[in-house]
UniProtKB/Swiss-Prot annotation:
PROSITE patterns: CARRIER, PHOSPHOPANTETHEINE. NCBIfam families: acyl_carrier (TIGR00517), PRK00982.1-2 (NF002148). Gene3D superfamilies: ACP-like. PANTHER family: ACYL CARRIER PROTEIN. It is found in: Plastid, Chloroplast. One of its GO terms (molecular function) is phosphopantetheine binding. This is Acyl carrier protein 1, chloroplastic. 4'-phosphopantetheine is transferred from CoA to a specific serine of apo-ACP by acpS. This modification is essential for activity because fatty acids are bound in thioester linkage to the sulfhydryl of the prosthetic group. The lineage of its organism: Eukaryota, Viridiplantae, Streptophyta, Embryophyta, Tracheophyta. Belongs to the acyl carrier protein (ACP) family. It comes from Casuarina glauca (Swamp oak). It comes from the Eukaryota. The modification O-(pantetheine 4'-phosphoryl)serine is found at residue 91. The gene is ACP1. Pathway: Lipid metabolism; fatty acid biosynthesis.
């Protein structure tokens, strides 16, 4: 049994078929092993948030669209954590990225939602949310 409460931990399986999990804003972690319990690690934080990462395929598609829209070299490192601004995107580039995402995924991103997208992961999470909403 493991208990995790309120800064940030990332867990990933050794099996490639399983998607990584992320938990943000942890306060403590306790991992008892074979009947032995270790003192919990305590960290400063006021709240607990669980982030559900988008499917890796969605993140990969978003990375490809971002690379294309920003005319980045194929060997550019674009990941879920990549910020559009850090990649050199200005506001017009961001609008074009959102338009490319809408076309690729068959979704409509509202202006308020588009303004909240800062990273590739933000975009991928929003896309999956909109696809789920559209099909449900």
């Amino acid at each position: 049994m493991a208990s995790v409460t309120g800064t940030s931990i990332s867990m990933a399986s050794f099996k490639a078929s399983l998607a990584p999990s992320r938990v943000s804003n942890l306060r403590s972690v306790s991992l008892p092993i074979k009947g032995k319990s270790f003192a919990p690690l305590r960290m400063r934080s006021a709240r607990f948030v669980v982030c559900c990462a988008a499917k890796p395929e969605t993140v990969e598609k978003v990375c490809a669209i971002v690379k294309k829209q920003l005319a980045l070299p194929d060997d550019s490192a674009v990941t879920g954590e990549s910020k559009f601004a850090t990649l050199g995107a200005d506001s017009l580039d961001t609008v074009e990225i959102v338009m490319g995402l809408e076309e690729e995924f068959g979704i409509n991103v509202e202006e308020e939602s588009a303004q909240s997208i800062a990273t590739v992961q933000d975009a991928a999470d929003l896309i999956e949310k909109l696809i789920e909403k559209k099909s449900g």
